């Protein structure tokens, strides 16, 4: 190859790469607001699953405050990242003003398919609803516990329970309740 051909090839490649990068940036700039709007709608849907009576959801520093139509506080939704068997488990949990759980949702997990992934099932998550205090422990580890672990996925079950218990302890410490 001649030196001129190599330089021409490099210049053409540089122009194509620069143009492609520019076009990609423009597409991102155009679609980002739509993507953000869609993400916000999905979050609102999730919040309404946890607090069906919630009308307004306000992001605070460490939680989402939930209000009804008359601006009365209904509770809070917390974001938890807890170590599971297969990696981090990302959880959203809602507490009412009395400290009882309104709902739990698993956003992300990488647990063992067919076993640990059962932590996302309604039958497991619904066990937490309406409970507080020692009731949130797995029966296997605490005589006052009311949560059944998933057979073959005790570590995953315990991770969800422990994450919720940590948030509950933090709430109690902040409010001065023992």
Q: Where are the model-predicted features located?
A:
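Flexible, solvent-exposed loop/hinge segments and secondary-structure transition points
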Residues: 2-178
């Amino acid at each position: 190859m001649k030196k001129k051909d190599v330089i021409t090839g490099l210049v053409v490649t540089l122009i194509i790469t620069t143009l492609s990068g520019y076009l990609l940036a423009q597409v991102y700039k155009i679609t980002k607001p739509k993507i953000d709007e869609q993400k916000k709608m999905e979050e609102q849907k999730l919040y309404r699953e946890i607090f069906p009576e919630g009308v307004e959801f306000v992001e605070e520093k460490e939680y989402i405050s939930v209000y009804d139509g008359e601006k009365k506080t209904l509770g809070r939704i917390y974001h938890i990242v807890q170590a599971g068997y297969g990696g981090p488990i990302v959880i959203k949990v809602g507490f009412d003003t009395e400290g009882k759980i309104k709902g739990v949702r698993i956003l992300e997990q990488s647990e063992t398919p067919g076993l640990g992934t059962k932590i996302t099932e309604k039958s497991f998550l619904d066990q937490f609803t309406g409970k507080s205090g020692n009731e949130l422990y797995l029966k296997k580890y605490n005589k006052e516990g009311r949560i059944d672990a998933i057979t073959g996925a005790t570590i995953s079950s315990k991770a969800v329970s422990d994450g919720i218990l940590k948030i509950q302890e933090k709430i109690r410490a902040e409010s001065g309740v023992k």
